[in-house]
Structures are given as C-alpha cells and as structure tokens.
Amino acid sequence: MAEKPKLHYSNIRGRMESIRWLLAAAGVEFEEKFIKSAEDLDKLRNDGYLMFQQVPMVEIDGMKLVQTRAILNYIASKYNLYGKDIKEKALIDMYIEGIADLGEMILLLPFSQPEEQDAKLALIQEKTKNRYFPAFEKVLKSHGQDYLVGNKLSRADIHLVELLYYVEELDSSLISSFPLLKALKTRISNLPTVKKFLQPGSPRKPPMDEKSLEESRKIFRF
C-alpha cells in the first residue's frame, strides 16, 4: 500500500490550503507534519528537503515536491482532474490563473498593515463583483454544463469553490448576483469527498486570526 502524502507546513491555510482541498476532493488521505517554530523550518532547510528554502513541501510518491503550483499540477494530473487533452488543460490553466489572482489578494489581506486593510478589502470586493465572478458566471452560462471544463469535475471547479468560500467569509453578499456560481458551490460542496472535508474536525483550516498571524510571524520571521 502506498504511503499517504505528507504535507509540511504550519497549521494555517496559507499556500498549503489549496493542496489540502485538491487532495481531499480527490479522496486522498494525507498526513500533516506541522512546522511549529522557526527552528523546525530551519531543520527542513538544513536537511536539504526544501529546494528553494521555502514551504509548502509535500512528500508524495518518493518525491519531496516544493512550489505550490508544481504540487497542484502533479496532484491534478495523478488523479485525473486536469482535463482530457491539451485544449481542456489550457482552459483549466487559464481559469485557475484568474482564481489565483483573486485568491492571492485574499491570502495576503491579513498580513497587510491595519490602516491599509479597509482599502484592500474594498478593492477585493470591487474586483470580485466586477471582474472575476462575472467572468466565471459567463463561462458556466456559455455552455450550460455542470462544471467549468468538459462537463467533468476538474481542479478548476475545486479551486473556484475554495475561492467562493473565502469570498463568502469576507462578504457573503457578493455571490448573490451570480446564480450559476452559487449552484456550482452547492454542487461541489455536496460531492462526498468535499462534503467530508467541509465537516468539523477535517484538515481544513480556519481563517487567519491574531494568534495564528503572530505564530506565522515567528515561524517565517517576517
């Protein structure tokens, strides 16, 4: 029996959460080795496990993979969540780059200066409502299918629904004008593997709070 993937990161969402989501949606059980101190991170670096001296790092299939996109690409390919041909893969890549653009803004929001947060939140709300959500609503409307690409579950659906949850935490009203996105969120959330991941006690991480922010500052020395 193959070993479970082992995820090396701190006990926060950060850049590992999309990896947790994708593995969970694929029905893959995984272990987490939490980095709890700067010394834990130094040990991984000194042992030569981090090619570019940074996490996330995932041990899978005899490899120690770093760089979030590389890890996600491997998982999506391995578990048939990356389209059936190069055209579908290109569409998936295009969609997830857009998802990542908005996701990055949300990811970095808690780390910004307090006096900047209101303006940055307003920018996220504006771009969500006027740029990103309309684009994905249009895709779903254009083909009338249940999923973004090829009428089959792909990583694009999973990453988008993860993003929808994050946006909902910031402003639950933003999705109200996008019925097809709401339907996609419900559809993906009801998949057995995703439903399990959304339950309390799963490896899914909560939003960043002051305590986890301070712990992150100590671990990553910023």
From Swiss-Prot:
Basic and acidic residues bias spans: 206-222
SUPFAM superfamilies: GST C-terminal domain-like, Thioredoxin-like
Residues that, per the record, bind glutathione: 9, 45, 54-55, 67-68
Assigned keywords, A-Z: Acetylation, Cytoplasm, Transferase
Single Gene Ontology MF annotation: glutathione transferase activity
Organ and tissue specificity: Liver.
Domain of life: Eukaryota
Presence of the UniProt keyword Cytoplasm in the record: yes
N6-succinyllysine PTM positions: 4
EC number in record: 2.5.1.18
Region (Disordered) residue spans: 199-222
Catalytic activity: RX + glutathione = an S-substituted glutathione + a halide anion + H(+)
Subcellular location: Cytoplasm
Chain positions found as N-acetylalanine: 2
Boundaries of every GST N-terminal domain copy: 3-83
Pfam families registered for this protein in UniProt: GST_C, GST_N
Biological processes per GO annotation: epithelial cell differentiation; glutathione metabolic process; xenobiotic metabolic process
Homology family: Belongs to the GST superfamily. Alpha family.
Quaternary context: Homodimer or heterodimer of GSTA1 and GSTA2.
Functional note: Catalyzes the conjugation of glutathione to a large variety of electrophilic compounds.
Name listed for the protein in its UniProt record: Glutathione S-transferase A2
Lineage: Eukaryota, Metazoa, Chordata, Craniata, Vertebrata
